[in-house]
Amino acid sequence: MSRTLTTPVAIWSDLQISAIMASHMIDSGRLTENDLALVAALQIAPRASWAVVARATKTSPVTAARRWRRLVDSGAAWVTGAPGMSVWNAHCVAYIDIRCSPGQSLAVAAALAQDRHALSVELTAGGSDLFVTVAAADLSALSRYVLERIDVIPGITNTQTRISTHLYRDGSQWRLGALSHEGASEMQVPLLSPEKAHPIVLSHLQVSDREILVQLGLDGRSPYATLAASAQVSEATARRRVARLLGSGAVLMRTEVAAHLAGWQVPVVLSVDAPTNRLVETVRGIAGLPQVRLCATLAGTPPIVVQAWLHHVEALHDFETTLIKAVPNLTVVDRLITLRTVKRMGRLLDEDGRAIGAVPMDVWTDPLTVA
């Protein structure tokens, strides 16, 4: 099934208009407390009804829906459906540090951002110019993507690819913490979970399941009618498939926010070392920290990658101190500070971190074909 990818150039003028219309909800470059509470509620249950969200945020369903529409239209927040950690762990995921010729980093990032297999693309300061998260169906497909696509992009001078052996935490588990305890309790809605005891084996994902997953990646709150049309199934079937995908953990919904608008100004990437016999203990300790958005073990040296959001640059050393206190046996080997996120889990972002488009995370396809 062919798709037209939405690019920043194609939609920029429309997004500017939407951003102007929605500008009243942002005060001095920050989201309001009501906006943050709404995003926080949807982080807990991204596909919850507006009635449930309204109870949690002490507003009306109409007001909650209208506020969310403004956030989405301005690119300040969005919901993405992504393969769950069990699916990523069954696939082949890698983290690539890229060095570029002077003046070429932006062009390389823009080229990679249009690729379905490049899930996230970040311009960084430190030992690398770019930090890229990629995924493919298997090691063979990943090898083709790295060797026959990434390595031949003009402007790249060096790459270091580290393959993930296990993902312990991802962005779907990160929380703003902007909702009251009472409100958070309201959002603990059941996930239609009879399927939870029966995880989906990767090879059992049908083509229609993948089409639904791809559509959820474009808009995690897509109506069932839209999901049904994308998968060419009935609406009732789409409902059952979504319940199965969510209940089994094959799909995780993640409510995202433009980081700086929420006060998280500094994304960082840390390379962490730990004794092999204490690797699992270490990553579990790291994954429990509230700043952490990603924690994975790697087939490489050092064997752990950590991504976190911080409020300011000076907080980096405090965060490292917190890491060492939580897990004394670790050593931070390297640090990258993200200068600009060009793409986050399929979503194209502008220089201010606002969503301006999306590329389907159709990682099952041949990485060298053009959509």
Feature names for model-found ranges:
Residues R3-A371:
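A compositional/biophysical signature of low hydrophobicity enriched in polar/charged and small residues
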